Amino acid sequence: MVRKIAIYGKGGIGKSTTQQNTAAAMSYFHGKNVMIHGCDPKADSTRLILGGKMQTTMMDTLRELGEGACTPDKVIETGFGGIRCVESGGPEPGVGCAGRGVITAITLMERHGVYENDLDFVFFDVLGDVVCGGFAMPVRDGKAEEIYIVASGEMMALYAANNICRGMVKYARQSGVRLGGIICNSRNVDGERELLEEFCERIGTQMIHFVPRDNIVQKAEFNKKSVIEFDPECNQSQEYRELARKIIENTDFVIPEPMTMDEMEDLVVKYGVLD
């Protein structure tokens, strides 16, 4: 049965890069059939899988061809490791609601049975924080059963992770969605691992993996590839391989217990994130 995973995190945290490298590792190292559904108007959730290509989005296709012509063969492309890719896209700048585009795109994919076809994993790569009902849809309506949050030892990344947990709690009991853990995408700040470990303990989850910072990630991006495609034998590829394995084998799913603002302030002061 296909496992549906939503990846959340603060804008700029490296969420899409982490998600694409994890998906590539699942396919390349673990032989899994994977699909990525990008839920960001920037439509950059799949470009490393597609060799740098910015694929035509579902919303663009809807505007140009109409709903009847917006079929899977028009909007799904296959990239590295046989990973299937689709991008929701969004409205024209300054017009309409991008969150609504996510709702429309997911509904259309479900109508065509796309998420059920011979897949092991579907990743929903969701814009930034839980900012509105549209972007909360994978949580709210049970489209995803598992949530992973990408964070770091930086203050705003932790605040965003805590806010995402607050959004999860609101919908978890009705939708059945659960938190699978925090992925630390390291920024090499002092005490980062210890801070994230305590944060995870305080909210009742696990740090499923600590991804070290490595310049090969940027080098691979410059070459329009995931790290796994660029150099599958390098140390960073092995980190993503391990992260993928941990997600595949994960059985530790919880409804988190978000921290209060005062508790968050105390935590970041304790580790010197605030002076």
UniProtKB/Swiss-Prot annotation:
Binds 1 [4Fe-4S] cluster per dimer. Its EC number is 1.18.6.1. Pfam families: Fer4_NifH (PF00142). The reversible ADP-ribosylation of Arg-100 inactivates the nitrogenase reductase and regulates nitrogenase activity. It comes from the Archaea. ATP binds at residues 9-16. Keywords: 4Fe-4S, ADP-ribosylation, ATP-binding, Iron, Iron-sulfur, Metal-binding, Nitrogen fixation, Nucleotide-binding, Oxidoreductase. Its cofactor is [4Fe-4S] cluster. It is an enzyme of class 1 (oxidoreductase). [4Fe-4S] cluster binds at residues 97, 132. It catalyses: N2 + 8 reduced [2Fe-2S]-[ferredoxin] + 16 ATP + 16 H2O = H2 + 8 oxidized [2Fe-2S]-[ferredoxin] + 2 NH4(+) + 16 ADP + 16 phosphate + 6 H(+). One of its GO terms (biological process) is nitrogen fixation. GO terms for molecular function: 4 iron, 4 sulfur cluster binding; ATP binding; metal ion binding; nitrogenase activity. The modification ADP-ribosylarginine is found at residue 100. The key enzymatic reactions in nitrogen fixation are catalyzed by the nitrogenase complex, which has 2 components: the iron protein and the molybdenum-iron protein. Belongs to the NifH/BchL/ChlL family. Homodimer. This is Nitrogenase iron protein 1. It comes from Methanothermobacter marburgensis (strain ATCC BAA-927 / DSM 2133 / JCM 14651 / NBRC 100331 / OCM 82 / Marburg) (Methanobacterium thermoautotrophicum). The gene is nifH1.
